[in-house]
A protein has these predicted regions:
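Short amphipathic alpha-helical segments with coiled-coil-like heptad repeat character
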Residues: 58, 70-78, 223-227
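Soluble catalytic domains of enzymes that build or remodel membrane lipids, polysaccharides, and related
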Residues: 148-224
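Generic structural hydrophobic/aromatic packing signal, biased to beta-strands
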Residues: 3, 31, 48, 58, ...
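Activation targets extended, charge/polar-rich intrinsically disordered C-terminal tails
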Residues: 1-9, 194-287
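Alpha-helical transmembrane signal-anchor/signal-peptide segments
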Residues: 42-61
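Transmembrane alpha-helices and immediately adjacent membrane-cytoplasm interface residues
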Residues: 8-44
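Glycine-rich catalytic cores of cysteine/serine-nucleophile enzymes that process amide/ester linkages
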Residues: 65, 70, 76-173
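Short, glycine/acidic-rich beta->alpha junctions
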Residues: 50, 107-109, 218
Length: 287
């Protein structure tokens, strides 16, 4: 869209030497492109990459929840994997709390958060809000502003969504924090996730890097009342949560707290152990 508009402007300025006339035609071209852009509709019916080929959906019956299309891929490398989609059931009366992962891949200002809910002693289900890419697509921060990617809520086993980032993707560093959310707050947030998951399965949405992304959605679903610039520059969102008193810190200063939250080595040591979730939490503040 932006490149097409740029070409149109250059062509217009070359073709029309009259300044007023050129500006008017540029504005007309801009309005035309904008109106066309606003007609673009998101869809669930595209040639999706295998790891986002299915959309999760949930059935809720009192305290009993069944989630379909839980992703639990068998990875050999980042790009070589066997997709697996499972159905899992949860008892809402057993929800204990929620944790949050932050993964960095370059800039300290940008991260990808994943929220994980704990049921019972060692049962976790992770929620990752992402771009839903078609076959052949790669992520572009610029395209993320322009109705290019659909939004997807990936519901996953931690051995999938976490281990993919710690064990298989190159140059990614992940950190794990336990929140102080009560079981009641965790339950309400979990149900908000499920309602949104069911809604976008029937009414798909565009991802937007500014207004409809991984972090803005988490803040809305968790009922965060305060706006903070670190919701957008989310590489600093862990410090925001620390300062608000939302994390179990063990009374550590932030730098030390974050250092001990780094889980890559523990995740690699755990591999595909069924006890993966316990092992990456063991010995860390708040767990």
């Amino acid at each position: 869209v932006s490149s097409g508009y740029g070409i149109a402007m250059v062509g217009t300025l070359l073709a029309f030497r009259g300044r007023g006339k050129g500006i008017a035609i540029c504005l007309a071209a801009f309005v035309f492109v904008l109106l066309w852009w606003l007609t673009l509709k998101p869809s669930n019916d595209r040639d999706w990459q295998p790891d986002v080929a299915q959309t999760a959906w949930a059935e809720i019956d009192g305290d009993h929840v069944t989630i379909h299309n839980v992703r639990n891929c068998d990875y050999r490398t980042e790009g070589d994997y066997t997709p697996r989609w499972e159905t899992r059931s949860f008892d809402l009366s057993q929800i204990r709390g929620m944790d949050i992962f932050f993964t960095y891949w370059g800039s300290p200002w940008i991260a990808h958060p994943v929220v994980s809910f704990q049921f019972g002693d060692h049962d976790y289900i992770a929620m990752s809000i992402e771009t839903r890419k078609e076959v052949g697509e790669v992520y572009s921060a610029v395209r993320g502003f322009f109705r290019y990617y659909e939004l997807i809520y990936t519901v996953s086993d931690e051995r999938d969504v976490v281990r993919l980032r710690t064990n298989y993707r190159k140059g990614e560093e992940s950190y794990l924090f336990h929140t102080l959310a009560t079981p009641e707050h965790a339950r309400a947030t979990f149900l908000n996730y499920l309602k949104k998951i069911n809604r976008i399965r029937n009414r798909p949405e565009w991802y937007n890097a500014l207004t409809n992304n991984c972090t803005t959605n988490i803040a809305a679903l968790a009922g965060e009342p305060q706006w903070d610039w670190r919701v957008l520059l989310n590489g600093r969102a862990d410090q925001m949560l620390y300062e608000r008193g939302d994390l179990a810190t063990g009374n550590l200063p932030f730098a030390q707290f974050k250092e001990q939250a780094h889980i890559n080595a523990a995740a690699r040591a755990a591999g595909d152990d069924p006890d993966f979730s316990r092992r990456i939490r063991e010995g860390r503040a708040g767990f």
